[in-house]
Each structure stands twice: as structure tokens, then as C-alpha cells.
């Protein structure tokens, strides 16, 4: 791989390692991509692999979806892609982007490409919508990228490396910088501030001082970005292998005050008597511990909670957001947070709804927040079978996530206390497993259904059937499965004590 722009040789060892990785990855670049480069060259146009795929090559990662930039117009690009691919489509012609797919051959995966004409966007002050203008140079196109590590390219088919802004040196040094001034870059598109936090999590990059200073000064600008775009960046951050650095960027720069204010609010002041822990740091630790308890991956979904699991991670991060509103200093110097799980569930629902998360995710995270303290009543292992059934029923399909959230919520440094909690939860899981051997716990129902209730009581459909059903469900919770005759008699006894209204 040749280079058209030499980079700062420091740190030399890190640069050399990155270059070796890139050579390995780019050597395995899909032959179809190189063929595509030749097709553009034959038509008199430039084509370069740009952005994330180039960055990832230096990190030793491969990308299935490939992004290209070209000197060709969208119309010219479409003609070339129609010949190269098995399918092509208009992604955003007004933005210069055409997509194509070449189907799998000889066992290789499909090759999907997006090709965009060189652009030199201009933004009006205070606007996040660019005036799109097509450019004529690769360097000009790279200058509009968000960060230098994403402003690298490889010309095809020659495999010439292009790095006008020192992105490779920044990647080797582990620093996140912008190709133009950070103020200008974030004013052009404030979402780039969220992307900075996301890359801190995904790539382990630290923010250049100019980038950090600009975010601190411009955090309020994120308000003009749609909630959906903010949500998507937050989701990508949380699904990183280690979200903590990205979350710390959000909080430390003030960006979280705008997009997730409940998180920085957890930095409760620690008084001189240390009467409570820093709930913010506790929550970050719970998140890390929950991630460690995920099972398998989305690619290899083994176990009950394959990671990365967004619902579990959101619940781990936000489970204590009700504490600031419920904090009380009690006599004797203690601090209480009574009912913070209920208050927190409401806050979680409100915030995630505002961020446009889907209803299922909102309900699940709010429910886990509401239930995260339920286990602590089991500390002395005195729950009845009925209480265990209710625990399982209340958690429903979230039970495996609740197991992991509850275990992760123990961050005490007191080893004896931590062991006690762990042993107690082991015992609860054992109790659940034993009950499952004898009865169905996944969806507990009364031993009689609605039709049977009506037949025994000699009544038709109506509210009385529902009341009887709820009574039998309570019996099922309390006593487990019972003989049908016993349940039928219990139903008649209930009907005698609770006659229909008006009789």
C-alpha cells in the first residue's frame, strides 16, 4: 500500500503496527471492490474507499458494507454500478449517493457498496442542514468528515493511501481530532459531539483538548438535532464493548445535561461523613458488571441474554435515577431513598420516550427499574413459594435480565456482605428452578379457564367471570397447581361469599 501523504512518524511503533494490520486487511479486500475501482478508472473517474472501512482496516477489522467516494456524478455512478452489481438503488441522489449489491459467489458473502460523489458541503450559521455541492477533489471531500480518523481514504484500484489530516497518526496516538476547527465542525453538525462520545467508547480514543473544549462550550447546540439521531448515537455508545469512557465524555462535557440529564444528576454530593456512595460511579460499575453477565453475542446468540443487550444495559445505567428525588437524611446520619425504584421507573419511561425509543424497550427498561429492589426482601431466604411465583410472574420475559441486573447491583466493597447477597440470589434461583420442575412458571394461569368458570357457576360472559378468574389466579399463586375438583369447590365457595350485585 503506497501513501500519498506521509504522516507524523510518532509514535513510530504504533504507526508501524497499524500499517501492518491495514496491509493484512486491505490485501483481503473483496476482489469485487478492486474490480469496481478498475471500472471507474476505465470510465475516467476516481474511486476511493473512505471513512470507517479504512479506519477499521488499520484496527485489523473488516467491514462488510463498503463506502466509496468518487469524482463521477450520481448519473455516471449509476451506469457503472448497474454493470458491476446484481442490484442497484438510489439512496439519496440529491446527496450524490447510489447503492449496489453483488450477490455472493463461491461461498463469499454479498458485497454491498455505497458510492457518493465528492462533496463540499456548506452550512449556514446556526443551521444543521447543509447546502450540498458536489466537489472535484478527494481531499476536499475528506475535509468535511467528522474526525481525522474517519478522513482517510484508499484510492482504488492502486491501493494508494490518502491521509491529508493526519488521521493515521491520531489513530496511533489514540486521539480524536477534527479535520477543521472543532467549533466549525460541531456547528456544522452538532450530532458530531455525540459521535465523539461514541468513538471514545467504541475505539477507546481520548478527546483532543480543542474537541473537548468545543463540546463544553456548544453542548446546548445538540437541542436542534432530532431525538431519533441522538437516540441512535446513544444506542451505539451503549452497545460498545466498554461504554464507560463514552458516558464519561457525555457527563464531563455537559452533553449529558442536554440529552440524558438523569445521569449527571446521580453525582450526589458526598458529605464529609460519607453517608452514601456516589450513585453515578455506582451506576457505571453496575453497567460494567451487567455487561460481564451477558451471554454469547448477537452473532452467536447462546444463553438467555446474548450481548450486547440494550435493554439490560439501559436498565443497569438508569436503575437508580429515582434516588436524587427521593434522598432523605435520617436521624442518626443515615440516608434513605424510599420508593426510588418507583420514581425511577417513571423517570425512565419519560426520558426514553422523549428519546424516541420503541415502546417495548421503554416498557422493559422501566419494568426492570421498578423491580430491581424486589430481591432484597429475600435476604434471609424467608420467601414462601407464593412469593417466588410472584417474583417470576412480575418479571415475566424479563426474568433473566432481572437476574443479571440484581446481581450487578451489588458493588459493595464489603466482601462478607457481597458474598451474602450472592449466596442469597443463588438460593432464589435454586428455588425458581425447583418450582419449575413441578409446575409451569413462565405464564401462570388459574387451574380453570373462563369457559369452565362460566359452566361451573352457570353464568354467561361478563365482569363476574373476570372477578372469579382473578380470585383463582390468587389461589394459584398462593398454593401452586391444585386438583381440578378442589379448585372448582373453591370457586363455588367464592361465589357464595361474593354473590352477584343486586341479589
Where are the regions a protein language model picked out?
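Catalytic cores of the polymerase beta-like nucleotidyltransferase superfamily
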Residues: 1-503
Amino acid at each position: 500500500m503506497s501513501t500519498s501523504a506521509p504522516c507524523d512518524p510518532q509514535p513510530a511503533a504504533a504507526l508501524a503496527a497499524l500499517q501492518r494490520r491495514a496491509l493484512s486487511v486491505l490485501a483481503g479486500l473483496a476482489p469485487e471492490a478492486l474490480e469496481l475501482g478498475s471500472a471507474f478508472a476505465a470510465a475516467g473517474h476516481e474511486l476511493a474507499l473512505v471513512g470507517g472501512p479504512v479506519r477499521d482496516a488499520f484496527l485489523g477489522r473488516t467491514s462488510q458494507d463498503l463506502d466509496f467516494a468518487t469524482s463521477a456524478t450520481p448519473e455516471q455512478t449509476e451506469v457503472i454500478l448497474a454493470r458491476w452489481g446484481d442490484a442497484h438503488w438510489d439512496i439519496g441522489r440529491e446527496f450524490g449517493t447510489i447503492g449496489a449489491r453483488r450477490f455472493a459467489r463461491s461461498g463469499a458473502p454479498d458485497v454491498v457498496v455505497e458510492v457518493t460523489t465528492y462533496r463540499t458541503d456548506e452550512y449556514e450559521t446556526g443551521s444543521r442542514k447543509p447546502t450540498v455541492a458536489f466537489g472535484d477533489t478527494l481531499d476536499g471531500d475528506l475535509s468535511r468528515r467528522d474526525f481525522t480518523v474517519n478522513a482517510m481514504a484508499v484510492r482504488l484500484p492502486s491501493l494508494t493511501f490518502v491521509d491529508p489530516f493526519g488521521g493515521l497518526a491520531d489513530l496511533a496516538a489514540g486521539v480524536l481530532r477534527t479535520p477543521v476547527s472543532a467549533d466549525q465542525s460541531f456547528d456544522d453538525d452538532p450530532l458530531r459531539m455525540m459521535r465523539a462520545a461514541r468513538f471514545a467508547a467504541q475505539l477507546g480514543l481520548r478527546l483532543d483538548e480543542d474537541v473537548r473544549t468545543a463540546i463544553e462550550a456548544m453542548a446546548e447546540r445538540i437541542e436542534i438535532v432530532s431525538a431519533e439521531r441522538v437516540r441512535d448515537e446513544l444506542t451505539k455508545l451503549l452497545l460498545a464493548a466498554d461504554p464507560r469512557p463514552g458516558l464519561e465524555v457525555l457527563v464531563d462535557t455537559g452533553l449529558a445535561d442536554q440529552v440524558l440529564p438523569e445521569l449527571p444528576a446521580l453525582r450526589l454530593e458526598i458529605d464529609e461523613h460519607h453517608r452514601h456512595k456516589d450513585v453515578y460511579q455506582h451506576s457505571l460499575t453496575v453497567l460494567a458488571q451487567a455487561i460481564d453477565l451477558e451471554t454469547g453475542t448477537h452473532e452467536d446468540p447462546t444463553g438467555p441474554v446474548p450481548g450486547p443487550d440494550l435493554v439490560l444495559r439501559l436498565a443497569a445505567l438508569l436503575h437508580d435515577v429515582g434516588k436524587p428525588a427521593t434522598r432523605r437524611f435520617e436521624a442518626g446520619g443515615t440516608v434513605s431513598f424510599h420508593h426510588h425504584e418507583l420514581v425511577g421507573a417513571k423517570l425512565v419511561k419519560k426520558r426514553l420516550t422523549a428519546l424516541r425509543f420503541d415502546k417495548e424497550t421503554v416498557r422493559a427498561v422501566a419494568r426492570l427499574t421498578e423491580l430491581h429492589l424486589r430481591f432484597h426482601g429475600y435476604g434471609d431466604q424467608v420467601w414462601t413459594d407464593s412469593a417466588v411465583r410472584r417474583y417470576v410472574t412480575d418479571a415475566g420475559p424479563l426474568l433473566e435480565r432481572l437476574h443479571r441486573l440484581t446481581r450487578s447491583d451489588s458493588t459493595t466493597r464489603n466482601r462478607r456482605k457481597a458474598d451474602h447477597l450472592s449466596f442469597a440470589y443463588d438460593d432464589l434461583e435454586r428455588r425458581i428452578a425447583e418450582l419449575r420442575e413441578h409446575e409451569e412458571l413462565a405464564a401462570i394461569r388459574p387451574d380453570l379457564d373462563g369457559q369452565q368458570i362460566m359452566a361451573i357457576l352457570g353464568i354467561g360472559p361478563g365482569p363476574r367471570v373476570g372477578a372469579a378468574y382473578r380470585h383463582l389466579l390468587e389461589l394459584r399463586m398462593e398454593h401452586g397447581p391444585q386438583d381440578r375438583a378442589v379448585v372448582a369447590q373453591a370457586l363455588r365457595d367464592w361465589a357464595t361469599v361474593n354473590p352477584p350485585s343486586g341479589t
